[in-house]
Amino acid sequence: MPPLFCVLKAFFIGLVVSLILVKPLIWLKKQGLQDRIHKDHCEKLEKLHKNKAHIPTAGGIIFVLSVVLSILLLLPCNLWSTWFLVGATLLWGALGWRDDQIKNKRKVGHGLSAKRKFFIQNCLAIGTVLPIMIAYGESFLCMHLPFVGIVSLPHCWLGYLFSFSIAVLAIVGTSNSVNLTDGLDGLAAGSMVIACLGMLIVTFAYGAPWAFISGVLLATLAGSCLGFLYYNRSPARIFMGDTGSLFLGGMLGICAVLLRAEFMLLFMGGIFVLESLSVILQVGSCKLRKKRVFLCSPLHHHYEYKGYPEKVVVRNFWIIEFLCVAIGIFAVFWG
């Protein structure tokens, strides 16, 4: 089956699964998992988001189902890599699902503690990167840098350690960044569609050994997020929850590792990077200077505080993500 046809098929699998299954999932979630509007030390946010209370959450399970289905239908079942990806998909989905379950049981809406979640994410990332590094062999030391091209690291333990660390950081960092971005109706889902389509172009341009697998994953994620966006756009009828955001970020990071293009995430996931930087700057400034840089973080909440309508913020952030991806694509062909 031609690779391009498989990628298109993966996109439509994700799209159709989301469009068909999200609607009944909305009804099912109303029986259990619902969003909490409690925000620590953010009474204004609680008022702004009071209309979001009791909206079904954890809808991101759709993404997990879509990816597993695509992998089983489009990749050879006699290869270890197929079952490795199925396992990674289920484990990353399980992390977010467990977090949403705990949030639902607690009145204040807190899930796993930040330290425990970070520890589990690192364990999952290490368990994901190690088999990829072994499969790549010495080729794992080759990395694609924006505007530069392929760079080969020294063939020594330091080179492997650096490559391994960057890969783990890319997965964990992207997972948390998408999680931070998921704060407004349609923001994370729409941004993921743009990011995944951008990474698809990188896939065809680089042609890494695992490019076909990465293409199938990215196309499925793009289609699934697009279908989910129909129900998640303002006013949202369902939220992806941590089940969706942690999973989407983790899978986007894994795709970058498969392509040996972790640094391309700085552009392809530009809006996610900006959201994370806003939180880092805010926390750092509060601790060191006892002052805030933003009215509230992540960045999208800052503009909510300034009085911008939610739809305007989401639309503008999508535009920023599109521009970042455009720069990233230029960086690919320039290098």
UniProtKB/Swiss-Prot annotation:
Q: Give the subcellular location.
A: Cell inner membrane
A molecular function (GO) term:
metal ion binding
Pfam families (alphabetical): Glycos_transf_4
Cofactor(s) essential for the protein: Mg(2+)
Q: Which NCBIfam families match?
A: mraY
Which cellular component appears as one GO term in the record? Answer: plasma membrane
Q: In which pathway does it act?
A: Cell wall biogenesis; peptidoglycan biosynthesis
What's the gene?
Answer: mraY
**Membrane topology type, per the record?**
Multi-pass membrane protein
One GO biological process term is: cell wall organization
Q: Which UniProt keywords apply?
A: Cell cycle, Cell division, Cell inner membrane, Cell membrane, Cell shape, Cell wall biogenesis/degradation, Magnesium, Membrane, Metal-binding, Peptidoglycan synthesis, Transferase, Transmembrane, Transmembrane helix
Respond yes or no to whether keyword Cell division is given for this record.
Answer: yes
Lineage, opening ranks: Bacteria, Pseudomonadati, Chlamydiota, Chlamydiia, Chlamydiales
Q: Which InterPro entries match?
A: Glycosyl_transferase_4, PNAcMuramoyl-5peptid_Trfase, PNAcMuramoyl-5peptid_Trfase_CS
What EC numbers are recorded for this enzyme? Answer: 2.7.8.13
* Protein name as catalogued: Phospho-N-acetylmuramoyl-pentapeptide-transferase
Catalysed reaction, written as an equation: UDP-N-acetyl-alpha-D-muramoyl-L-alanyl-gamma-D-glutamyl-meso-2,6-diaminopimeloyl-D-alanyl-D-alanine + di-trans,octa-cis-undecaprenyl phosphate = di-trans,octa-cis-undecaprenyl diphospho-N-acetyl-alpha-D-muramoyl-L-alanyl-D-glutamyl-meso-2,6-diaminopimeloyl-D-alanyl-D-alanine + UMP
Q: What is its main location?
A: membrane
